[in-house]
Amino acid sequence: MIIDLTEIQDIHFFFRLEFFKEIYEILWVFVPILIFIVGITISVLAIVWLEREISAGIQQRIGPEYTGPFGVLQALADGTKLLFKENLIPSRGDIRLFSFGPAISVISIILSYSVIPFGYNFVLSDLNIGVFLWIAISSIAPIGLLMSGYGSNNKYSFLGGLRAAAQSISYEIPLTLCVLSISLLSNSLSTVDIVDAQSKYGFWGWNLWRQPMGFLVFLISSLAECERLPFDLPEAEEELIAGYQTEYSGIKFGLFYVASYLNLLVSSLFVTVLYLGGSNISIPYIFVSNFFEINKTYGVFVTIIGIFITLVKTFLFIFVSITTRWTLPRLRIDQLLNLGWKFLLPISLGNLLLTTSSQLFSL
């Protein structure tokens, strides 16, 4: 059998085309991940700038204004400074625990973003147990803080790590019970299904109106999980210098700084998804469909609008969190634990029982 030169060239071209197609499919998998990383980075920088401007307004001072227009590049300048600072390690500390602690805290929080629906069909992984995966992953972060405190070989750092673990356990349980109530109302543990269940009646279909007590408990528990004032006992300056961060410097200290704002952002996003309708607009779907032709496959414009609505609701909660931080005093450790175990836990349990009863009677 004789094969001429043209056929050989066609075969080589076909194999080359298939190779480039496989490379393109592999690279396309990383495009959504890259978009999420860039979006999260910009959001964290925006939150840092907002916090500095809001705190300056509350305290009647100017705030950052020289680094970029209106001081928007101040957070970037601070991050660059931390990147080039010397990375100090305690001579008598556990180097492995000391080094892995910040990384575990940051990675566990970043993984939580994988189940958040930012818009229609704009979610990294739509899992059937999305909200439980978030709770499971977020519970790993205090382990990193405890490792950091123990590995520092410093009494203030160790006490800060113990406080972080105790605080996380105290407020993780009420938060989980509130998520269970939302899952019962939506008949699903998927974040996408929970958002869809709130879309039928627009503004009045939000879980905020059906679960007002659960919303308040979830709000307080989220602030406590973020370890922000009035719940920043693990890093109380007057008592523990900087808590588990005391011995850290350079990029490792920067990781804790980033983890704090990443946690605030992910908590705000879950408040939006679980209680504020996610990416849904406030107009009921029935009324919108009468005026606009809505296809099953939404376009890019609808996705962008959904992302914009999600971010607006999220930054509204972030504004409340920042204002709370700069207006309320810090709780004592006994007040913190009493609030979690004696008030929020019974309220969340009662809310879960009421939700279960209403769902059973509605069958």
From Swiss-Prot:
It catalyses: a plastoquinone + NADH + (n+1) H(+)(in) = a plastoquinol + NAD(+) + n H(+)(out); a plastoquinone + NADPH + (n+1) H(+)(in) = a plastoquinol + NADP(+) + n H(+)(out). GO terms for biological process: aerobic respiration; photosynthesis, light reaction. It is an enzyme of class 7 (translocase). The keyword Metal-binding does not apply. Its EC number is 7.1.1.-. It is found in: Plastid, Chloroplast thylakoid membrane. GO terms for cellular component: chloroplast thylakoid membrane. It is a multi-pass membrane protein. Its main location: plastid. Keywords: Chloroplast, Membrane, NAD, NADP, Plastid, Plastoquinone, Quinone, Thylakoid, Translocase, Transmembrane, Transmembrane helix. Signal peptide: none annotated. The chain crosses the membrane at residues 28-48, 98-118, 129-149, 253-273, 300-320, 336-356. InterPro entries: NADH_UbQ_OxRdtase_su1/FPO (IPR001694), NADH_UbQ_OxRdtase_su1_CS (IPR018086). It comes from the Eukaryota. Belongs to the complex I subunit 1 family. NDH shuttles electrons from NAD(P)H:plastoquinone, via FMN and iron-sulfur (Fe-S) centers, to quinones in the photosynthetic chain and possibly in a chloroplast respiratory chain. The immediate electron acceptor for the enzyme in this species is believed to be plastoquinone. Couples the redox reaction to proton translocation, and thus conserves the redox energy in a proton gradient. NDH is composed of at least 16 different subunits, 5 of which are encoded in the nucleus. This is NAD(P)H-quinone oxidoreductase subunit 1, chloroplastic.
